[in-house]
Design a protein with these regions (language model features):
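Beta1/beta-strand and adjacent pyrophosphate-binding region of the FAD-binding site
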Residues: 1-12, 173-183
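Glycine-rich flavin
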Residues: 2-4, 20-27, 33-173, 206-210, ...
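Flexible, glycine-rich terminal cap/loop adjacent to redox cofactors
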Residues: 7-35, 48, 53-59, 351, ...
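Short hydrophobic core segments
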Residues: 7-9, 117, 135-145, 179-180, ...
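Short glycine/serine/threonine-rich phosphate/pyrophosphate-binding segments
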Residues: 14-21, 161, 185-189, 195, ...
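Glycine-rich dinucleotide-binding loop and its adjacent helix/turn
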Residues: 47, 144-199, 203, 233, ...
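Short, acidic, Ser/Thr-enriched surface-loop or helix-capping motifs
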Residues: 114, 295-297, 406-407
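FAD-site-proximal beta/loop scaffold in flavoenzymes
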Residues: 157-174, 260-340
């Protein structure tokens, strides 16, 4: 048995960051991982592979407009998507990033323990790999992540009925892909495969796509999906049964649409489930409600010295949230062991969210409805990318930015973007919200020309109906 100051179970973006931060603060740290490589779902089966697919789809789509950019004599009529090459490139990027995490562990002198980690009480962890070992630690951080949610009657088989893990290794282009779930995962894969040439039907139980985003964003995304990519979006609809045939599947719909859809593949993108079973929580005083481990503002559970972060706690399921939670947990653990450090709990009202479909979507803060529900007197400013020179240069003059503000003080309550590079533009919004900028301050902030960022002061001016370029 080895004794550590800190053991982290799970090496995703929450776990590996927590391990590094603990080691930086002088804690003898171990990181437990059950899979073959470090990085967790985000690196191997989630964020990174999915965005690699999206980039391939974006490049493929751009080829069709080469002549508009003055690139002549290129015959794109014979162009086709090579999914095997996309999968191969995805694999190279994943391996490269995994090696980077391996290097960081060595650099920070973090001990790697290979196997399935399980709490067995009294600060001890069983690690079951090629052999079974038991190690102990003064502090333990759980970062066990999540898995694709299985729906009764719609079980995946990895062939025709897929989850978000399976589809990342698909080497044959679906002729017709039905996607159940219009959240971030669903719209990203809809955008990917529609651009690569698949017919796509997108099924969402809620009354709109991306139901947690501002309603104006959802409406715009549906319009662009339907108009530009011919994606068949069906909301207020669910799949009640699936019949498998040779070479196809038949989905029975109910709700606003009662059609039968025959397709080549079905992707289940209806969320994920936290991994909180079989990890030994019953041997602790930690509380679990509806599958989530309950924690305080420094990620500490009801069990002394036991922390939980990432997808197993009821906070936004985002890699960057997990990473920051890992830092908070590691710093509190170090502080409680006598290190001179002050942890900074996360302000969850200022978490940026990104969806990497085309057009991209990003947001931070309150939606217009949320703000009104919380009692604010709301003023909204919305400005399109269409008049922006840089958007037209890129050939992507679609979408808009929307600012939600409070009329009393001019405080910016939320910023919502749909359009080119939205997931990069949101970084400015994080700074604006963090600095508690007012609409008036933003109106008088100078942005360079020509850039996409010019939409920010224009949207601020739109709050007072004073936009210059519209």
């Amino acid at each position: 048995m080895a004794q550590f100051d800190l053991i982290v179970i799970g090496s995703g973006p929450g776990g590996y960051v927590a391990a590094i931060r603990g080691a930086q603060l002088g804690l003898q740290t171990a990181l437990i991982e059950k899979d073959g490589g470090l990085g967790g779902t985000c690196l191997w089966r989630g964020c990174i592979p999915a965005k690699t697919w999206l980039e391939s789809a974006h490049r493929y789509e751009q080829m069709a407009s080469l002549s508009e950019f003055g690139i002549a004599n290129v015959d794109t009529s014979k162009m086709k998507a090579d999914l095997s090459a996309i999968v191969a490139r995805k694999g190279k990027i994943v391996i490269k990033n995994a090696k980077g995490i391996d290097f960081l562990m060595k650099k920070n002198k973090v001990t790697i323990l290979k196997g399935f980690g399980k709490l067995i009480g009294s600060g001890r962890v069983e690690v079951k790999g090629e052999t079974t070992e038991i190690h102990s630690a003064k502090k333990i951080i759980l970062a066990t992540g999540s898995v694709p949610r299985e729906l009764p009657g719609l079980e995946t088989d990895g062939q025709q009925v897929l989850n978000s893990d399976h589809i990342l290794d698909l080497t044959n282009l679906p002729s017709h892909l039905v996607i159940l779930g219009g959240g971030a995962i669903g719209v990203e894969f809809a955008s990917t495969f529609a651009r690569l040439g698949s017919k796509v039907s997108l099924i969402e139980l809620a009354d709109r796509l991306l139901p947690i985003e501002d309603e104006a964003i959802s409406v715009e995304l549906s319009k662009i999906f339907t108009r530009s990519y011919k994606i068949d979006c069906k909301v207020k609809t669910k799949i009640t049964s699936v019949e498998k045939k040779k070479g196809s599947i038949v989905c029975q719909l109910s709700g606003a649409c009662n059609d039968r859809l025959e397709a080549s593949h079905l992707l289940i993108a209806a969320g994920r489930s936290p991994v909180t079973s079989k990890i030994g929580l019953e041997s602790t005083r930690a509380k679990v409600e509806k599958g989530y481990v309950q924690v305080n503002d420094v990620m500490l559970t009801a069990e002394e010295g036991l922390y939980a972060i990432g997808d197993i706690v009821n906070t936004p399921w985002l890699a960057h949230v997990a990473s920051d939670e890992g830092i908070v947990a590691a710093e509190h653990a170090a502080q409680s062991l006598g290190k001179s450090i002050e942890p900074h709990p996360i302000n969850y009202t200022r978490v940026p969210s990104c969806v990497y479909c085309d057009p991209e979507v990003s947001s931070i803060g309150l939606t217009e409805k949320n703000a009104k529900d919380q009692g604010y007197q709301v003023a909204v400013g919305q400005f399109p990318f269409m008049p922006m020179a840089k958007a037209n240069i890129l050939g992507e003059a679609h979408g808009f930015i929307k600012i939600v503000s409070d009329t009393k003080y001019g405080e910016i309550l939320g910023i919502h973007i749909i359009g080119p590079k939205a997931t990069e533009l949101i970084a400015s919004s994080v700074a604006l919200m963090g600095g508690e900028f007012t609409v008036q301050t933003l109106m008088h902030t100078m942005y360079p020309h020509p850039t996409l960022n010019e939409v920010f002061p224009e949207a601020a001016r739109a709050v007072h109906k004073q936009s210059i370029n519209m």
